């Protein structure tokens, strides 16, 4: 185990167009091979699609989607007396955001639309309406935690 302690958290600069740190974090999640320009273009095009179709502010739709995706509970494996238990634990706020962004991008990539901006826009709009694969993932995570509620006393 490392003796130095945890690495310091880096401060994320807010996005130049929407002035939001959450948007910057989404761009960072979308980015592949360090191509930030391409990731930014994908996100801004997706936001244009959202604005065109909903007629409302895309950042508002995105924040609504994130609130519907971010999990409150998750399960963590804990070994007690030779058997593993799935122990439900509360998710820390920073991890909630990280998981929400990860699920949003992963399930957007798996969608069937032609271009990535279309996929991302559809997934964000679906999540804002409480449908879509990323919201289903959150519901499944909560169901797992609820099903294993009996092992909550093993929390550490």
From Swiss-Prot:
PANTHER family membership: RIBOSOMAL PROTEIN S7
The record ties this protein, via SUPFAM superfamilies, to: Ribosomal protein S7 (SSF47973)
**Subunit structure, briefly?**
Part of the 30S ribosomal subunit. Contacts proteins S9 and S11.
What terms describe the molecular function in GO for this protein?
Answer: rRNA binding; structural constituent of ribosome; tRNA binding
**Mind telling me what this protein is named?**
Small ribosomal subunit protein uS7
> Does this UniProt record's set of keywords contain RNA-binding?
yes
User: A GO BP term, please?
Assistant: translation
What this protein is reported to do is described as:
One of the primary rRNA binding proteins, it binds directly to 16S rRNA where it nucleates assembly of the head domain of the 30S subunit. Is located at the subunit interface close to the decoding center, probably blocks exit of the E-site tRNA.
Q: Which species does the entry assign this protein to?
A: Pediococcus pentosaceus (strain ATCC 25745 / CCUG 21536 / LMG 10740 / 183-1w)
Pfam families, A to Z: Ribosomal_S7
UniProt keyword rRNA-binding present: yes
Classify the source by domain of life: Bacteria
Organism lineage reads as:
Bacteria, Bacillati, Bacillota, Bacilli, Lactobacillales
The family classification in the record reads: Belongs to the universal ribosomal protein uS7 family.
Q: Which GO terms describe its cellular component?
A: small ribosomal subunit
Question: Which of UniProt's keywords are assigned here?
Answer: Ribonucleoprotein, Ribosomal protein, RNA-binding, rRNA-binding, tRNA-binding
């Amino acid at each position: 185990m490392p003796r130095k302690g945890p690495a310091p958290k880096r401060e994320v600069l807010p996005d130049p167009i929407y002035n939001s740190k959450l948007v910057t974090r989404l761009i960072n999640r979308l980015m592949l091979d360090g191509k930030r320009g391409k990731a930014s273009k994908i996100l801004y095009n997706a936001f244009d699609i959202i604005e065109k179709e909903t007629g409302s502010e895309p950042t508002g739709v995105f924040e609504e989607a994130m609130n519907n995706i971010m999990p409150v509970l998750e399960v963590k494996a804990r070994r007690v007396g030779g058997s593993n238990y799935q122990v439900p634990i509360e998710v820390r706020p920073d991890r909630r955001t990280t998981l929400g962004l990860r699920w949003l991008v992963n399930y957007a990539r798996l969608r069937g639309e032609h271009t990535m901006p279309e996929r991302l826009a559809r997934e964000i709009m679906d999540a804002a309406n409480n449908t879509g694969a990323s919201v289903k993932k959150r519901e499944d995570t909560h169901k797992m935690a609820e099903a294993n509620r009996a092992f909550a006393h093993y929390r550490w």
